[in-house]
Amino acid sequence: MLTIKQLRDDREAAIRRLAKKGVDAAPVITEIEKLDDRRKAIQHDLDECLATQNQAAKQIGALMGQGRRDEAEAKKAEVASLKERSNALNAEFKEVSDALQAAIVTLPNFPADIVPEGKTAEDNLVVKLVESYTQLPENPLPHWELARKYDIIDFDLGVKLTGAGFPVYKGQGARLQRALINFFLDCNTRAGYLEVEPPVMVNEASGFGTGQLPDKEGQMYHATADNFYLVPTAEVPVTNIYRDVILDEKDFPVKMTAYTPCFRREAGSYGKDVRGLNRLHQFDKVEIVQLSLPEKSYEALDGMVAHVESIVKALKLPYRILRLCGGDMSFTSALTYDFEVYSEAQKRWLEVSSVSNFESFQANRLKLRYKDADKKTRLAHTLNGSSLALPRIVAALLENNQTPDGIRIPEALIPYTGFDMIK
């Protein structure tokens, strides 16, 4: 969530920066300014009313002590009237404050200066490209055909049990899935991330804190009986560990990693891009989260990008790194790098990770702060990234390692799978 100060200090700059994300912010900022001015005016009136009320209340006892009962009764009536007015002002203050908050949360985060201009994924900037490591057979099979051939993923059984987008992993497929999760977690913990195992259901405050609510409410599974949400990413519960927390400067950086199943409704998704593992309602993902001092958050982002790249490299997959344009960025992000691996069988790139700096946007919602060397309280910066999302990694591993004799397992994974070939 942006702060009022960010929006009011340089209105035109705020409008210009949000336009890069395709948002016409001028009408919203105008409304925010009006509501902010109204709130300040109500606060001023309320403070004056309470001061007068307190002064009048003090006078009642003195008047009674002097035997001036009629004047004391008049003061009591005045205090009662002032109390009624202060209650009305309090109610109005809350109403205006709620309206102000509702207006502010409609605005996305400012994109960083180096974010490319653009509206769609076609405008993203490729910052690195690494070609294929392996020679594939002619006419390679897509992963959904390989899954059927080797009986390692059953999409039809998932439909029977739940519905489309809920595959069942079997045999070597299930072991590969477990191996990847453990490999990713081990890579992360070796890099200094503390492993945590969070709940996969969160409350509304957690969803709001990281920015999924209200922006992505329609994409989240909602258990209405208890008003809990299934997590779309471990980012939500892990970052919310520090909601309403004030850290010391010496506590940074805070580095955490977690594996969770993730749940997304993906409403409106259809067509060839959703076949097989390309787009699921339930999938496994390992996440890394960092909390950083503001002046060090972009250095932290570079480190996270390098870390995710080291994992993709270890799997020996063809990949590229993109810097997302303003129109393709998330609501909460200030700067995002996407990792994509190439599917030769599908002739397309598959996203397997997004690594983002949110600056203070999430921290402002979370009330995640720290005390600096001067003991002043400031907002921290938050970052996160997938390291990695499994479905498309599995798809790419199957497709890029297929041979006439089976599917090779990358060397780095063999200690985790216990086998070197899917047959």
Spell out what each predicted region is.
Residues 1-134, 152, 156:
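N-terminal alpha-helical targeting/anchoring segments
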Residues 26, 129-423:
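TRNA-recognition modules of translation machinery and tRNA-sensing kinases, especially anticodon-binding
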